[in-house]
Amino acid sequence: TRQVVVIQRQIPPLMERMADSLEQFVSLDAPFSLDERTKRINQVRATLSDPKVTASEQVRQVLEAYNIEREYGRTIETYEDSIELDGEGKVVNILRIGRLALMYQLKDQSEAGIWNGSDWQEVDGFRIPVRDGIRMASKTAPLDLLAVPVQVKGGE
C-alpha cells in the first residue's frame, strides 16, 4: 500500500541520522575501545550506503550498534592500550566500569589515574583499588565493592 512505500522511503534517512547521532555520541564519550567502536560505525555506514542491503537489515545493524553502546554502561572490562601521559605514549592497563569510570594503571602498577572528561589525570592513593578492579574485570578475582575515583560533571 501507499503507507508502506512512504515508510520505506523514510527509513534510509532515519538510519543515517541515527548513525550520525551514534558517531557523535562516541566522539563525545570517554575514549575507551575507540578502534572497535569506530570500526562498528564504519561498518554501519558501509551497510547504509550499499543499495543491495535491505532496509530491514539496515535497521537491524543500526539497532545492534546502539545496543552494543548501551551495554557498555552495564559492564566492567579491562584491556591494554597506549595512552598519552605527560606528553609521551605509554602502554597501560585500562579499567572501564560501565560509563561511571575510565581508569588506567601503568604496567608496573606504580601509577593509576582517571579520564577526567578531557585528559588522563593521575590520582594518588588509588593504585590498589584500580589493580583490584583490573583483577575483577579479568575474572582473576571475585567481584566485590570497589572504591574508585569518579569524575562528576558540573559539581564542585
Across the structure, where does each feature detected by a protein language model lie?
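General N-terminal targeting signals
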Residues: E23, Q61, A65, I76-Y79, ...
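Charged, low-complexity, helix-prone segments enriched in Lys/Glu/Asp/Gln
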Residues: R37, E69-Y72, I76, R127-S138
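Charged heptad-repeat coiled-coil "stalk" segments of single-pass membrane proteins
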Residues: T1-V59, L63-R70
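Soluble extracytoplasmic domains of inner/organellar membrane proteins
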Residues: Q43-L100, K107
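Long mid-to-C-terminal scaffolding/interaction modules that assemble large complexes
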Residues: G87-E156
